[in-house]
C-alpha cells in the first residue's frame, strides 16, 4: 500500500501509455499512439532534457510527471518546468500528486534550480487545490503563438 515515486523505467511503457492517454483525454487533447511514442522516446533517452517520474502503488502505476530544466536569463539561473502531472482518477486524493511534486522539487533542489514552474487549466479546481497548498500562484498570463 506504500506509495513509491521513481524514475520511469522501460518496463513501465504500457502503464505509462495508459496514464498519458488519460491525461490527454482529461484535457481533451487529441493524442495519437505515434505522439505517445515520441514522448516515450524522449523519456527513454538520457540525452533528452525531458525526464519522467511515476507514482506506483501495489505494483501499479497511478501517476506520472514529466519535467525538464529551462534557462531563466533575467535571473541568470536555471529552473525546472513541469510539463505534465497526472494521477489516475481512481487514485486521486491519496497524496500521489503532492508526492510527485515533492520529487520534482527535490530533483530541482539537488541540481541548483531556482524554481519549479508549471501551468494548469483555470477550471482544474481539484488540481489547483493541491497546487495552492504547495506552491504560489504567479501573476503571469500565458500566451501561445501557434506555428
What are the functions of these language-model segments?
Residues 4-18:
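A short beta-loop-alpha structural element at the N-terminal edge
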Residues 18-31, 73:
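Helix-loop element at the rim of GNAT/NAT acetyltransferase active sites that forms part
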Residues 31-52:
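Active-site rim helix/loop that mediates acceptor-substrate recognition in acyltransferases
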Residues 54, 60-68:
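Conserved beta-strand in the GNAT
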Residues 91, 95-103:
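Conserved acetyl-CoA pyrophosphate-binding loop and the N-cap/start of the following alpha-helix
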Residues 98, 122-141:
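Conserved active-site alpha-helix within GNAT-family acetyltransferase domains
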Residues 109-119:
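Conserved GNAT acetyl-CoA-binding A-motif
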Residues 117-127, 146-147:
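Conserved beta-strand-loop-alpha-helix junction that forms the acyl-donor binding cleft
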Amino acid at each position: 500500500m506504500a506509495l513509491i515515486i521513481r524514475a520511469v523505467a522501460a518496463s513501465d511503457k504500457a502503464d505509462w501509455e495508459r496514464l498519458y492517454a488519460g491525461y490527454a483525454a482529461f484535457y481533451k487533447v487529441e493524442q495519437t499512439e505515434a505522439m505517445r511514442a515520441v514522448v516515450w522516446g524522449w523519456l527513454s533517452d538520457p540525452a533528452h532534457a525531458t525526464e519522467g517520474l511515476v507514482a506506483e502503488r501495489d505494483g501499479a502505476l497511478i501517476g506520472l510527471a514529466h519535467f525538464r530544466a529551462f534557462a531563466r536569463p533575467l535571473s541568470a539561473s536555471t529552473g525546472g518546468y513541469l510539463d505534465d502531472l497526472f494521477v489516475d482518477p481512481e487514485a486521486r486524493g491519496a497524496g500521489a500528486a503532492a508526492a510527485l511534486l515533492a520529487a520534482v522539487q527535490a530533483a530541482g533542489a539537488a541540481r541548483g534550480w531556482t524554481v519549479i514552474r508549471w501551468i494548469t487549466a483555470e477550471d482544474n479546481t481539484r488540481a489547483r487545490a493541491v497546487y495552492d497548498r504547495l506552491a504560489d500562484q504567479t501573476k503571469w498570463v500565458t500566451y501561445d503563438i501557434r506555428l
